[in-house]
């Protein structure tokens, strides 16, 4: 059978390249290769014959072309299967904005604890624009075995040659350790699964890596603040920056999450919050936000947080809202300007947040345009003037109809 032959060939390629491709093809269940309802022998044959006509060797195409082609296919799948896409694909405009906030430099270490197909790490490599300075600097962990294999292939096809993608449950078993402590990174970024249930709260409550330093949400609450605390503990104490996508509920939910949020505010690591438009993410109608944290705030940012309302900064399309490059630039400029802009941004002090009982809901802070309210006496005057004008118009029309003989006087 042709599919078995292909599977054997893929496994042979994997065995011949253990340093870069180990586990990439064998991570897929045999059913993926042998399901004739999805890919018949005839279609496989046609596909092989078509690809055989193309020159796809390293000498024919650059890594960017091959990598972008692979990424295109990943996005195409995400477009066609929105319900399942959220677990592995983050819209590239969101990724671009997060990487711009982090501003990774050549030589910085970059870590994604929920890396999906590796898109955030690839964008970081593009941003640094120096492949040699990213060697050994890119790290990712992904729970899903097949998705972690896709991530490794994705980075490989984008020209990555020295990166580390591991498979495992980050919250239960973080893979990156140094001297039995969490490894620290210059840049930490992720779009973890929103409000993940049954994520391992019991073990996290006595976490040996200290990731529960501000508290432990329950399994029913979801893992949002567990992810955030893991990422904060993974930041380099001196240079660490962190950008994470979370549901907007983390900004105002009470109970244990409210207590953790209070500690987050008082730590003064939080530099910017961006409330995003709805309908941008696959597979969820939940409104999301980006939290940007910095262990090395500039002097004029200390004790302050920039709140950005980007809920109206998007480009509508038929199937899904998107953020264009222009939209991303507008949001990023609101952060770099770090100023008050009516209906768009507000720089608040920690004291102002304390006065709001540590709620970080954007609409509590960003100023809205003042609507002009017409005094009641003016409304009354305008009403009677309009009523009088209507009566005069009716009288004039009646007069014309009488003159024309259309109605009797």
Model-inferred region functions:
Residues 78-81, 133-135, 315-316:
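Short small-residue beta-strand/loop micro-motif enriched in glycine and branched aliphatics
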Residues 84-190, 195-206, 210-213, 226, ...:
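Conserved S-adenosyl-L-methionine
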Residues 179-409:
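A conserved structural/catalytic subdomain of Rossmann-like adenosyl-cofactor enzymes
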Residues 1-106, 164-175, 275-279, 300-311, ...:
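Non-catalytic, mostly N-terminal accessory regions of nucleic-acid modification and defense proteins
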Residues 40-41, 66, 70, 123, ...:
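Short, flexible segments with low predicted structural confidence
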């Amino acid at each position: 059978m042709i599919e078995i032959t292909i599977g054997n060939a893929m496994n042979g390629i994997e065995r011949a390249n253990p340093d870069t491709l180990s586990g990439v093809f064998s991570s897929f269940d045999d059913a993926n290769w042998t399901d004739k309802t999805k890919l018949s022998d005839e279609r496989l044959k046609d596909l092989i014959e078509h690809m055989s006509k193309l020159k796809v060797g390293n000498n024919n195409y650059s890594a960017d072309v091959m990598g972008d082609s692979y990424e295109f296919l990943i996005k195409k799948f995400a477009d066609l299967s929105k319900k399942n896409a959220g677990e592995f694909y983050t819209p590239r405009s969101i990724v671009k904005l997060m990487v711009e906030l982090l501003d990774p430099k050549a030589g910085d270490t970059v870590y994604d604890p929920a890396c999906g197909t590796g898109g955030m790490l690839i964008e970081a490599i593009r941003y640094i624009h120096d492949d040699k300075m990213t060697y050994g600097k890119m790290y990712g962990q992904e729970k899903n075995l097949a998705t972690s294999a896709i991530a490794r292939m994705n980075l490989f096809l984008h020209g990555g040659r020295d990166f580390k993608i591991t498979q495992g449950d980050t919250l239960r078993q973080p893979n990156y350790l140094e001297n039995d402590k969490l490894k620290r990174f210059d840049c930490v970024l992720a779009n973890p699964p929103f409000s993940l249930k049954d994520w391992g709260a019991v073990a996290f409550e006595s976490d040996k890596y200290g990731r529960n330093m501000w508290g432990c949400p329950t399994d029913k609450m979801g893992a949002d603040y567990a992810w955030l605390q893991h990422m904060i503990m993974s930041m380099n104490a001196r240079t660490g920056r962190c950008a994470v996508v979370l549901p907007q509920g983390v900004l105002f939910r009470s109970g244990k999450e409210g207590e953790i949020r209070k500690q987050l505010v008082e730590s003064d690591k939080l530099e910017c919050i961006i409330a995003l438009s709805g309908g941008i993410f696959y597979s969820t109608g939940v409104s999301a936000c980006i939290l940007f944290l910095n262990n090395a705030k500039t002097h004029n940012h200390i004790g302050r947080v920039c709140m950005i309302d980007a809920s109206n900064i998007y480009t509508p399309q038929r199937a899904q809202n998107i953020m264009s490059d222009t939209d991303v630039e507008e949001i990023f400029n609101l952060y770099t300007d770090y100023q008050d802009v009516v209906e768009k941004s507000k720089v608040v002090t920690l004291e102002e947040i304390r006065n709001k009982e540590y709620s970080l809901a954007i609409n509590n802070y960003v100023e809205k345009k003042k609507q002009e309210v017409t005094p009641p006496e003016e409304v009354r005057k305008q009403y009677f003037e309009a009523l009088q004008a209507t009566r005069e118009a009716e009288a004039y029309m009646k007069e014309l109809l009488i003159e024309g003989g259309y109605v009797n006087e």
